[in-house]
């Protein structure tokens, strides 16, 4: 004989279906729960079925053929008792899936074979009987009560004690859940039914017994008037004797098996009148609403409460199960969620570490897809559990997912923000440079507006592509407003920068124009002749009006620059305040340019050169601008004195910037104006202080307009006089040199004495050709006006040769004793005219001595 006890270890480690041929022992005889129940359900493909499964338990006395009944009804292989012995076969509680492949039966029927009652092995120990009944009632939809016909009407034989226990634990189980009335089906299968007693009579007897049992149990407050039909439905079926009518038994069990299908309650039947359904046994209200994937965990929790004699609270157990399963499902769906989202999180965090925010392609689609899949997967698996727990855990899942997705969303918007700002700045700069290279006018405001619109459109495109519908954090209006605000700030900064560049270009233009115009005024300074220094038309400029002309040129140039600046700034969409600041800066910068140009022209060397040129113009040229050729009869001293005094009047004139019309400095402070109220410290930091305009500078306008100090004026006067004296001495020499003339008779004497040589030259072709070449060279030299320089160079070379000869002679004499004695006896004095010595290295460009110009050479 084989008993179920032999298979008690099955299911502990095996993972294939053959190991579960006899089912799985859910609870062994030692009241231990088998943790591999979930594995069995998974192998039988019950786990994914959700609520689409049914659980049946069978009760009855020991050795009454419960396992045999189940094997015939459901095709299971529960071990049965040998007919040769009568002892306990089923130990604990076993479970097996329905093997009957009849299409009329419900799918996924799980059958529990409960250890029989009233067995001699346990004797009077009814603890397991009560615990197993409680477990079966807490988990099963249908309770099959297996009794023999001859036991109907008996107390012990008809399992009345067991049924009383069932009624009591039913109230215990569902008392705490008063919102729902849980129902179960008690299906009485009457074995060895002979048919002599009508089944209706047996039903009546059993129902009377049920009513008495219900009335006999202790009921909690509020349920004193309840009856058994409030909690239980009843069905009855009679089976013939298996031993005496085996074929009939098989036939009837097959018919009975067809009733294990989904059914509907017939409202026309009244159980109190003995009207019972003979249709499908699985009504929706019987189902315990425990999803198949959580059944093993639920059953384990139920048994743990039962075996530890704790108050069994099914709603609490359902919540605990829901908590456990929802946590498991949440972790599972988050694994799939992580597979999609983690790569994007890694990319984003790496880009953030590198300081190079990157717009992640496909992020929005991945976020929406992963969130939807996670929520749907969770909903599909967890929605079958306790609604409150499910909703709470779903909210937790959405919160976890949304927290991470929000971070990605914010990071994406941040990347779009930073890259957009950078691209906007680069695009505006590139467009401006392109317009400058083409040489065509460009509208800066239009460029900024177009690029800003593109930047906003791109930002919105990225944001819309990343939005996850149905989430509160997907509203990017605030981020868009911040982005537009920064775009406006960057636009303002670019406009300020462009206006600075415009101002720089205008300043360079002013510098160029002033450099030319003011330079011309200085070049024409004090020209006293109608030659190259005089204007082509009209009268020559008056020296007294020099600063007036400079100021007028300056003001006109700056006004023209202001018009250019204002016209160009209008295309920048600049405000009036920005234009005012730009014009104010332009005037200050322009004054700095003018003052720098004046200082450049008025440095000591340049000014001394200007004074000498002014003096030479007045001294060397007459009033008609014709060069003077000095003769001994000319009033060289008078002309020299007038020219020198006239030039000396320029020194005090140039020392201070004063207008001839007002005899006062120009109104620089009024012309520049007050500092605009909108000017910032950045607008003033690169501006040089101006005396008389900036109070904190400590300089007056008079000091600002002082070009040459008094000490410099005196030094300049002395050096100019020395230079003028040199010019005067040179003029005096040229006049004296012209007094030496060759007598006319000398030319006749030269012709008479050299006649033979003349004839010899004319008759000799070689001499004649040489003479011809010399004549042509002399003519060309005359036409190029080079005779003067040649004569001067020759004279200087000869003088230099004489000087060098004297030097060598002196060195020779100094090297001998006789020479040293002769030198010692000689009187001091120089050689040459007036004691002057001329060296080639000391000649000026006219071939004259540069001794008189030694101060000018300090430029």
Curated annotation (Swiss-Prot):
GO terms for MF: GTP binding; GTPase activity
Transmembrane segments: 742-762, 766-786
Any GO BP annotation: endoplasmic reticulum membrane fusion
Keyword GTP-binding: yes
Binding site for GTP: 60-67
Family matches, as PROSITE patterns: G_GB1_RHD3
Membrane topology: Multi-pass membrane protein
Localization terms from the record: Endoplasmic reticulum membrane
Record bears the keyword Hydrolase: yes
Cytoplasmic topological domain: 1-741, 787-859
Residue numbers spanned by region Disordered: 817-859
Residues in compartment: Lumenal: 763-765
HAMAP family in the record: Sey1
Family: Belongs to the TRAFAC class dynamin-like GTPase superfamily. GB1/RHD3 GTPase family. RHD3 subfamily.
Protein name according to UniProt: Protein sey1
Naturally occurring in which organism (per UniProt): Aspergillus flavus (strain ATCC 200026 / FGSC A1120 / IAM 13836 / NRRL 3357 / JCM 12722 / SRRC 167)
Organism ancestry: Eukaryota, Fungi, Dikarya, Ascomycota, Pezizomycotina
């Amino acid at each position: 004989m084989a008993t179920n006890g032999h298979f008690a270890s099955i299911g502990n480690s095996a993972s294939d279906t053959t190991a579960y041929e006899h089912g799985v022992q859910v609870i062994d005889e030692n009241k231990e729960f088998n943790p591999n129940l979930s594995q069995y359900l998974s192998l039988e493909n019950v786990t994914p079925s959700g609520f689409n499964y049914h659980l049946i338990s069978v009760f009855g006395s020991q050795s009454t053929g419960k396992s045999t009944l189940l094997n015939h009804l459901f095709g299971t292989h529960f071990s049965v008792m040998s007919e040769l012995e009568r002892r306990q076969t089923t130990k604990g509680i076993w479970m097996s899936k329905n093997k009957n492949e009849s299409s009329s039966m419900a799918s996924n029927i799980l059958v529990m074979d409960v250890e029989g009652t009233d067995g001699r092995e346990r004797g009077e120990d009814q603890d397991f009987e009560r615990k197993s009944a409680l477990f079966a009632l807490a988990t099963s939809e249908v309770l099959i009560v297996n009794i023999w016909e001859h036991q109907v009407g008996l107390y012990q034989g008809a399992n009345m004690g067991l049924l009383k226990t069932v009624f009591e634990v039913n109230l215990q189980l569902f008392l705490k859940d008063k919102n729902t009335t849980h129902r179960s089906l008690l299906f009485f299968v009457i074995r060895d039914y002979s048919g002599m007693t009508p089944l209706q009579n047996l039903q009546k007897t059993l129902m009377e017994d049920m009513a008495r049992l219900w009335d006999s149990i202790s009921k909690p407050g509020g349920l004193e008037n309840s009856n058994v039909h409030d909690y239980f439905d009843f069905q009855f079926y009679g089976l013939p004797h298996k031993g005496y009518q085996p074929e009939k038994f098989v036939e009837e069990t097959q018919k009975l098996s067809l009733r294990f299908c989904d059914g509907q309650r017939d409202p026309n039947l009244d159980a109190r009148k003995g009207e019972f359904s003979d249709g499908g046994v699985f009504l929706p209200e019987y189902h315990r609403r425990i999803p198949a994937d959580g059944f093993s965990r639920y059953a384990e929790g139920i048994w743990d409460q039962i075996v530890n004699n704790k108050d069994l609270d099914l709603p609490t157990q359902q919540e605990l199960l829901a908590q456990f399963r929802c946590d498991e499902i949440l972790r599972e769906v988050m694994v799939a969620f992580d597979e999609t989202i983690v790569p994007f999180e890694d990319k984003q965090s790496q880009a953030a570490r590198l300081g190079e925010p990157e717009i992640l392609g496909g992020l929005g689609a991945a976020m929406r897809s992963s969130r939807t899949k996670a929520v749907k997967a969770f909903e599909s698996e967890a929605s079958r559990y306790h609604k409150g727990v499910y909703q709470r855990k779903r909210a937790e899942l959405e919160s976890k997912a949304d927290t991470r997705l929000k971070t990605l969303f914010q990071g994406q918007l941040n990347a779009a923000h930073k890259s957009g700002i950078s691209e906007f700045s680069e695009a505006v700069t590139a467009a401006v440079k392109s317009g400058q290279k083409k040489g065509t006018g460009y509208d800066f405001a239009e460029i900024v507006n177009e690029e800003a619109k593109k930047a906003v459109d791109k930002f919105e495109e990225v944001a819309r592509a990343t939005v996850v519908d149905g989430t509160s954090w997907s509203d990017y209006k605030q981020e868009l407003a911040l982005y537009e605000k920064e775009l406006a700030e960057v636009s303002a900064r670019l406009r300020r920068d462009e206006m600075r560049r415009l101002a720089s270009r205008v300043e360079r233009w002013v510098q160029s124009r002033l450099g030319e115009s003011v330079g011309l005024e200085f070049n024409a300074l004090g020209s006293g002749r109608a030659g190259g220094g005089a204007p082509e038309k009209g009268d020559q400029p008056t020296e007294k009006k020099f600063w007036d002309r400079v100021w007028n040129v300056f003001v006109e140039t700056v006004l023209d620059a202001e018009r250019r600046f204002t016209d160009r700034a209008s295309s920048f969409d600049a405000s009036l305040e920005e234009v005012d600041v730009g014009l104010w800066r332009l005037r200050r910068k322009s004054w700095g340019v003018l003052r720098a140009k004046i200082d450049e022209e008025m440095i000591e060397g340049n000014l001394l050169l200007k004074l000498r040129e002014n003096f030479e113009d007045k001294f060397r040229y007459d009033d008609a601008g014709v060069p003077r050729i000095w003769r001994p009869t000319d009033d060289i001293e008078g002309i020299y004195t007038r020219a020198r005094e006239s030039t000396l009047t320029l020194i005090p004139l140039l020392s201070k910037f004063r207008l001839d019309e007002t005899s006062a400095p120009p109104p620089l402070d009024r012309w520049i104006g007050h500092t605009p109220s909108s000017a910032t410290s950045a607008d003033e930091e690169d501006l040089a202080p101006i005396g008389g305009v900036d109070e904190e500078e400590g300089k007056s306008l008079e000091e600002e307009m002082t070009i040459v100090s008094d000490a410099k004026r005196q030094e300049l006067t002395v050096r100019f006089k020395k230079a003028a004296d040199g010019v005067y001495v040179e003029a005096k020499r040229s006049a004296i040199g012209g007094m030496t003339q060759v007598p006319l008779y000398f030319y006749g004497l030269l012709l008479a004495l050299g006649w033979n040589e003349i004839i010899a030259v004319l008759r000799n072709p070689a001499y004649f050709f040489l003479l011809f070449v010399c004549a042509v060279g002399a003519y060309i030299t005359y036409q190029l006006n080079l005779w003067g320089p040649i004569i001067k160079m020759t004279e200087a070379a000869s003088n230099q040769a004489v000087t060098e000869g004297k030097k060598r002679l002196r060195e020779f004499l100094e090297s001998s004793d006789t020479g040293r004695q002769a030198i010692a006896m000689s009187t001091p004095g120089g050689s040459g005219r007036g004691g002057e010595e001329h060296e080639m290295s000391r000649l000026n460009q006219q071939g004259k001595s540069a001794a008189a110009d030694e101060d000018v050479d300090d430029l």
